[in-house]
From Swiss-Prot:
Record protein name field: Undecaprenyl phosphate-alpha-4-amino-4-deoxy-L-arabinose arabinosyl transferase 2
One Gene Ontology term, aspect cellular component: plasma membrane
GO biological process: lipid A biosynthetic process; lipopolysaccharide biosynthetic process; protein O-linked glycosylation; response to iron(III) ion
Keyword Amino-acid biosynthesis carried by entry: no
Membrane topology field: Multi-pass membrane protein
Keywords, sorted A to Z: Cell inner membrane, Cell membrane, Glycosyltransferase, Lipid A biosynthesis, Lipid biosynthesis, Lipid metabolism, Lipopolysaccharide biosynthesis, Membrane, Transferase, Transmembrane, Transmembrane helix
Protein encoded by which gene: arnT2
Pfam families in alphabetical order: PMT
Amino acid sequence: MTSRIQMHRTSPPPAYGTSAPPSGFTLGASTTSTLQRWALPLLLVAFGLFYLLPLTSHGLWIPDETRYAQISQEMLLSGDWVAPHFMGIRYFEKPIAGYWLIAIGQAVFGDNLFGVRIASALSTGLSVLLAYLITRRMWNDPRKSFAAALLYMSFGLIAGQAGYSNLDPQFTLWVNLSLVALWFALDGRSTRERLLAWAGLGVACGMGFMTKGFLAWLLPVLIALPYMIWQRRLGELVRYGLVAVLVAIGISLPWVLSIHAHEPDFWRFFFWHEHIRRFAADNAQHTRPWWFYLPLLVASSLPWAALLPGTFMQAWKDKRQAPTGFLLLWFLLPLAFFSLSRGKLPTYIMPCLLPLAVLMGSALIDRINAIQGRSIRINSLLNLLIGVAAMVALLYIQLTRPVYGHNEMLGLSLVFIMLMGWIIANLLPAARPLQYWPAPALGIWLLVALLPAGMPGFIVHNQMPDQFIKEHIEELRQTKTLLSNDLGAASALAWRLQRPEVTLYNTEGELKYGLAYADSAQRKVSMAEVGQWVSEARKQGSVGVVMRVKDVVESEEVALLPPGGKRYEEGNMLVLILPQSQP
């Protein structure tokens, strides 16, 4: 067994496995000091420009964003911060903490797009800060700290999810915090410092557990146990780990007991349906082959994908060094665990990307110090190829089968600007890789900032139904009863009107469990019942209907509704205003 490797920080650098920069390319003390002073402010400016400003530029995507917006808004409306409800119906697929943060965003900034998405953006920003801090702790090199934070902030999957309201950025933050705290605990110089870090680990595990479940406890153990065995520090894990366990229990126990008292079936459903069934059952949701995450890892790391081979080679070479070994365990073991699960979604591997960014940042700066820009140039040329191919495809499609109408030139212009920015951002490092290596980040930031706002109308009206609902909000607000045949459209309607009581027409989806309760059974009507239901509802007042019509069955659903009233159509979306019937 490898003997314990002492972890220590050197000041000033060089770091593990790093030779001094050759003559001809040096970063002097003043340059290093300047970078150390301005690294975080520069990243903060980029965060504001490319993460925060675009949050209000486009509607809510279905199904995730409308769901999380509505569930969190309903907590504010009902005052129930214990049991999650989706349009007034029990919804036990996730615990509560993720909804808390989205609800706080809406409470502070209002029931708007910024309020719904700010929790994801801030969670990602804090993860960027964690990447910076752990790299600084491991190598004490401002260049590596800046590189790791920049790479993480510009990984395609991370940047894309930062402006998307769901629970994965939050959960990723808690996992990242737990493992950064673990490293700080292991590398602490004093007992007080170690205890604080172990307590921080407990806070992260408790919040992660209340965001997405037991995985928040499993992942730190999955990394800590083999690492401590390797380092011959298992006794330390047992002694200090108890602090983290007690803090995690203290954080989560009040809600655990409260939800059990409010909804005794919550833990049965959540444990078996969301953990055991999703991981091992033959009928698991989102079933994918074991290798699903391998190509996805390459796509997720764009615009830095061509740096992956060099990163892995350098990491394997340095695997016996404590920082690199820790990061490799953090990257590989969760990736293997998620690959073994039957149910897979792209965002599940987000907790693997921070250690990848740190390893990549370290390897990148080592190559720059050694005046080795070949991999940077290859990476930029790959990105150039992608950008030029996308530009040619856009022009060809627009000329032959236009996807943008004559009144959508703004959207087309935004996409064109985004692609030109991507191309220019990669031309610079292709020409001078050692000087302009950070430039590809600008390309991906322009993409996540401009592409959603530049979507053609047929995507907006089909995938962001809240925008079509917003156009008819005043008429819908005056209706007495609401009906919808699609959960995404229904939740968008409920969120825009701040009215959870939307009756579901011939659909149940993820609300199947909640609709089985007797007090929610009346919230669904079938095709056979809809005629009578509408007739009764119109006696009480006007009825607002929002439909998504994508196939023959949904066309038949529309045909069963009574004629008359006001009718508005756009893409697959249909809004009907059925007036109150005369007595």
